[in-house]
Each structure stands twice: as C-alpha cells, then as structure tokens.
Amino acid sequence: MIRKDQLPNIWNDDWRCAAAPQTVAIGAGSEEKLVLCAADDAPLFMLRDDGPYTVMPDVEHMTVTVAEGAGLCLYRLQGPNTPASHLTQLEVVLQRDAWVRMCTVTLGGGHVRNNVVVRMRGEGGSCVANGLYLMDREQQCDNYIFVEHAQPHCQSGELYKGIVDDAARARFNGHVLVQDGAVKTEAYMTNRNILLTDKAHVDTRPFLEIYNDDVKCSHGSTIGQLDEQAKFYLMTRGISERTAVTMLSYAFCDEVIRSIDIESLRDAVGDMVKKRLHGELTSCADCAIACKNPCNGPNAHFDIDPSKL
C-alpha cells in the first residue's frame, strides 16, 4: 500500500517548489512494482504544469519498508526538457529475505540530485540499484547512494552509467558499509562514464567501508571516450560517423536499460533513450549527442537497430 502522511504535493508561491513526501510499505511475502515518471513537460510530482521550460524546483522524499520475504521493483524516469532543479531522497529498509530492484533513468534537467539510502535490517536481503544519466548543455546530475549491510548473507549491486556532453557535469558518490556482524556479504559497485567533449566533467567516488573479513566486495569506476576503433569499424561498413557515435552511445546505455524487468517499460525507456541520442528530445548549439545545428549535418538516425545486434 502507499500511505501519504501529508498532502502528495505541497505548493508555495513564494518558495516556488513542489514537494511529494510519501511512505510505502510492502507487506510480508508480497511483490510490487512502482514506476515514478516525470513527464517531458513537467517535473516529477508537479502540482501544476508550467510547460517544457519551467524553472520551478521539485523535491521528492520517499520512505520504503519492505517486510520479510517481500520484494519491490522501483523505477524512476526523469524527463529531459525542463531546466528545473530536482531533488529526490529515497530511503529503503529491507527486512529478512526482502529484496529491492531499482533503476533511475535521467534524460536531462537543470540540476538533478538523486539520493538513495538502503539499509539491510534482516538476513538474506538483496538490493540492485542501477542508474543511467544523459546530460548536455550546462545540466548537472548528482547521484549519491549509500548501502548499509548490517546482517549476514546479504547482497547488493550498483551499476551507474552516464554520457556527459557539451559543458554538462555529473557526480557519482557510492558508499557501501559492511558492519562487523554482516558476514557472507556480497557487494559490488560500478560507475562508468563517457565524455563526448573536452568541456564535459565527471567526478566519481565509489567507496567501500568494511569491518569484517568474510565478504566478497568490489568497486570501480571509469571515465573515458567512445572507442575510436569501434567507430572506425562501423564507418568502414558504410555507416555515417554521426550514426556510429549514436549507435555506440546506445550500446553503452543498453546494459542499464536491459535491467528493467517490466518489458513494456523497458521498451519505452529504450525508445526514449534512442530519441534522446537522436536529438529529438532536446537541442542545443554545439553538443555532440543532441545537436540540431544544420552546419553539423542532419539529425542522427540508426541505419541499424543496435538493440538487435
């Protein structure tokens, strides 16, 4: 069930801010799917629609408790067209043998910050948290995730990927804490980033804090550019440079997209990412993935559907 402790949206003309506090309780033994979607023309949980260029910030705070043996799939879609600021705070508590699978797809925004806190309060808990962010112009996306392993035999895995274009910025801060009694813990954390211009910037900091030896844990991060050899190979097969860049970018994103369990949602997100890479969802003067400037040639399109490769 979803229990709303307060009004679902709080509006103040002076603050010009929408807030959406919610508490979600998943009963023992049940499995639920929850999709949070920000439309292209409005921020998440907007009380009013100010159009595609609204500057009103919004704040979302959600607390989720997953009871013994229960599970939750939680997906958040953040649209690209608004320069508004978004702040989301998600806190998840897992009881014995409970699990949660999360995926956050950020296709743009002014300044987006996603905070995720997961606490393993019972044995056998499992958490998978994935994220994808595509930023351009002067947009900024910050992802902060904290996972606490407080009980034995729990597992967690985080995979966040980002493509940062133009003068955009992205930050990833991941922290996994393994307490002294949390033996047989398995925890993995990865952050991968592609920079498409020399003005784009990424800060990444995956961090493990472990207080016992009976664990399997790893973490890592990468920041780089598209594979020039792969791009050249595609171009030698008659594919334009623009399309080759778009195809390689989509292939980079596909691992996160495929982690979405709901087939119809997975297909819809895949289509949105393709449109984003085509430049159909946003535009700017000189970015590499979303440029509609005629001097840079026609809009990108796929000669081949990369999802079929």
Could you tell me what each predicted segment is?
Residues 1-25:
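Short, Gly/Pro- and small/polar-rich lid/capping loops
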Residues 17-232, 236-239, 260-309:
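Conserved beta-strand/loop scaffold segments within soluble protein domains that form the structured core
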Residues 248-254, 273:
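Small/polar glycine-rich anion-binding or flexible loop at a beta-alpha turn
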Residues 252-262:
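Short arginine-rich
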